[in-house]
Amino acid sequence: MQDINIKLGDALELFKSIPDESVDLIIADPPYNLGKDYGNNNDTKDFDDYLEFSRNWLKEAHRVLKSTGTIYLFMGVRFISYLYSILERELNMELNSWITWYYTQGIGKTKGFSPRHDDILMFNKSKKFIFNIDDIRIPQKYYRERNNMRGANPGNVWEFSHIHYCQKNRKPHPTQKPEGIIERMVLASSNKGDTVLDPFAGSGTTLRVCQQLDRKCIGFELNPEYIQTINDRLNSEFNGFDSLDTRITRVPLDLRKKTIRDEYIQNHIRWFLNYHENEIEEFIKNVKEVYGEEAMLMSIEEIKNSKENNYDTTDDEKEEQLKFIAVTRDE
C-alpha cells in the first residue's frame, strides 16, 4: 500500500483540507520556539503568540482526530505544561502517558546539568482508543511463565540515540527524530491501512515509517527544501529503520523448559520477520550464545525464504510452518 501525501504550506491552512474525524493517529513535532533555523521565522514567536499558535493547531488536530484516535506531541520544557493544559482542560482529551525519550549524548553544560531527555505527551481523544501492546513488547531479561511470551510493556522511558550529524542517514534538518521512536508510536496506536497525520513533517520521518508499515500518511511542511528531502527519502531504498530499542534482540537467560524456549524463539522470529528482518541475525546470535549452536535449526536465509513463501498463507498456517524454524537443546 502506497498512500503517502506530503503537502506544502502552513499547517493551520492545510488542516482545513482534512475532514472532521478522519485521522487515526497524529504525531506532532512542532517548533519548540527556541530560535532554531528551520528555513523560516516560525521558531522565534513571542511567548503569547506561540501559545496562541499552539492552541489553534491543537484545536484543528482535535477536530480531525477520530474518537478512537491518539496524538503524540514532542515538546520542550518551556511550553510543555501549557500545551498539556490546552489538551486536557480546553480540549477535554485523556492523558495516556507522559513519555521520556532518554538519549545518552546531548549538549554539554558547565553551569547546570546537561540535558539528556526530551518529553512526549500521549493523549487520547476518548477512553476508547487503539493500543496494540503485542506489537511493541520488549523481551525481559528473565522470563517467568506468567509473563507474556512476546515480552513486557516497554514503559514510558524510551532509550533511543539521537541521529547524529555524522550518520549517513542524517538529513539536513536540525531536529530529525529517530525512526525507532516513530515506529513504536505507529505500531502501538494505529493499524494497517489507518491514516496518520504529521502536521510538521520536517525531514519526513513519520512518512517514511508509515510507508514501511502499511499506513496511509499525510504530512504538512512549510519549507519547500524539506519537501524535496522528504521525497528523496521516500524514494530511497529501504534497509531497515535507523534505530531501535536495543532490548528487542535480548534473549532471557532462564528459559529452562524446552517447550517454552521453542515457543519463545518462534514468537520472536515471527515478530522480526514482520518488523525488523535486518535484526534477525543479531537475535539468532544471542540465542546461540545462551542456548548453543544447535538452538537454531534453520539458517537466516532459510528463515527469510520461509517468509517469502508464506505471504499467501493464513496466520494460523504461518504459525504452524514456523514451528519448525527453531529448536533448542533437550533438557
Question: Where would I find each of the regions flagged by the language model?
Answer:
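Core catalytic lobe of class I
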Residues: 1-229, 294-296, 305, 311, ...
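PRPP-dependent phosphoribosyltransferase catalytic core
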Residues: 228-331
